[in-house]
Design a protein with these regions (language model features):
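S-adenosylmethionine
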Residues: 1-444
Length: 444
């Protein structure tokens, strides 16, 4: 994708990725539609698509706007479809439907001028043979849908999770709770920071808010890498919920700790900051490079090991072990709204089996008298509470830790002794990622 002029945000590219004829199009809209198509048709994840050379070639401001358009559209697909349905005799191809969805969301949801958006999307539709026959439909349907839904948008039902996820969550939590989660997903996620020093001081410097657990939540995100303290490594981005597993270990200086599935390194940095002797384990050498970069920026130290905990050839045991197991990541939808569209629920059974194996392997690394924290960023009980129950029934030398981590609310505790965190918690503060966390102590 050619780099657009930085003063206009427009370029002569086509939706198909090559110029068919010289059209002046809004590059962010073109790129956002490509992303939506990749997610909806090929089940690609947003994190994958923003690593392409086409996306990286965009100017920084266009990359930011592209992601804003794509993520906002993904959060409001249901609302957009409700607005469009009365004006469509039948659903068009998804590539056409995504142009319509983006148009409705940008005009009604983001407040962009209808005339400019519709005209540009008609031009985008005309730029490739696949969608060109639908330019008249795009023009007519968008104008009608935008006019009809204006003033009703905020009253429209929020985006529902797909059945493969919604059904088990409704069974576990009830429909009211699931609807509260969906509302939290629609609102998106602020940026949370874990800071290396006084949270209040950094909250003031960054115009943020100190959360009950000590994280700093930014009120105005902007470009993260240009904020004070980033280059100096004084803080790192980490959702508040994701900071609890490491802090619950309550590490002391000099203690040994193993961080299993360590990338991208937020928990490793928390542990290193405590003065513990940290060994970070991850199966991916590429992801471990990210951990090394983060440690270098923050001037913290850890021993990085690329290996699978299931067959790691090392007989050491540790004072503490943290396993953040690979999972469905369904607790992160508020910041990754592509997940309900990019995933279809397949593979979760295999993940659950892997999690059980990894939990048993991690437990073998805990010294007598040590402690183990197990967590997943999943909303599905089979990836959290069920594992804890099964493990505690089988491993009689481990018992649930009854302490309450800083900022955690007692009512979040689940029956087996862990904590079930949900995206609708702290709603007045902006929510949190969904997580399951349990600490278990090994007998001496």
């Amino acid at each position: 994708m050619p780099r657009p002029p930085q003063d206009s945000g427009r370029t002569g590219i086509s939706l198909a990725g090559k110029t068919e004829k010289r059209l002046v199009l809004n590059v962010a809209r073109v790129a956002a539609i490509r992303i939506l198509n990749g997610i909806m048709t090929d089940q690609k994840q947003l994190s994958e698509m923003v690593q392409t050379e086409d996306f990286k070639a965009l100017a920084p401001e266009d990359r930011a706007r592209t992601q804003r358009l794509a993520t906002h559209t993904l959060r409001h697909v249901g609302r957009a479809d409700r607005a469009l349905r009365p004006h469509l005799t039948k659903l068009p191809a998804v590539e056409v439907l995504n142009i319509l969805r983006l148009g409705v969301v940008e005009v009604v949801g983001l407040g962009a001028p209808a005339h400019a958006v519709v005209n540009d999307l008609v031009s985008i539709c005309s730029s490739t043979g696949q969608t060109r026959p639908y330019k008249g439909l795009i023009n007519a349907v968008l104008r009608k849908a935008v006019a009809d839904v204006s003033g009703k948008w905020d009253k429209s039902p929020v985006q529902m999770m797909p059945k493969w996820l919604r059904n088990p969550l409704r069974e576990a939590y009830g429909n009211g709770t699931v609807m509260a989660m969906e509302t939290a997903h629609m609102r998106g996620a602020p940026v949370d920071l874990t800071v290396s020093a006084d949270p209040q001081e950094w909250a003031e410097k960054l115009s943020g808010t100190v959360l009950p657990n000590g994280s700093v939540r930014l009120n105005d995100m902007g470009q993260i890498s240009v904020l004070p303290g980033f280059e100096d490594g004084k803080w790192w981005v980490q959702d508040a919920a994701a900071s609890w597993p490491a802090s619950w270990l309550a590490l002391q200086a000099g203690e040994t700790v193993l961080d299993v599935c360590a990338a991208p390194g937020g928990k490793t940095m928390q542990m290193a900051l405590s003065g513990a002797v940290v060994t970070s384990l991850d199966i991916s050498s590429k992801r471990m490079e990210r951990v090394a970069e983060n440690l270098s920026r923050t001037k913290l130290e850890a021993d990085l090991v690329v290996a699978n905990v299931l067959d790691w050839q090392d007989d050491r045991q540790f004072d503490a072990v943290l396993l953040d197991a690979p999972c469905s990541a369904t607790g992160t939808i508020r910041r990754h709204p592509d997940l309900p569209f990019a995933k279809d629920g397949t593979g979760i059974t295999e993940l659950i089996g892997l999690q059980a194996e990894m939990l048993a392997a991690a437990a073998r690394r805990v010294k007598p008298g040590g402690r183990l924290v197990f967590c997943t960023c999943s909303l599905i009980p089979d990836e959290g509470e069920v594992h804890a129950e099964n493990f505690l029934n089988a491993q009689k030398d481990f018992v649930v830790d009854t302490s309450v981590p800083e900022g955690m609310q007692a009512e979040w505790r689940s029956d087996e002794g862990g904590y079930r965190l949900r995206p609708d918690y702290w709603g007045e503060l902006g929510g949190m990622d969904g997580f399951y966390i349990i600490r278990m102590n090994r007998a001496s």
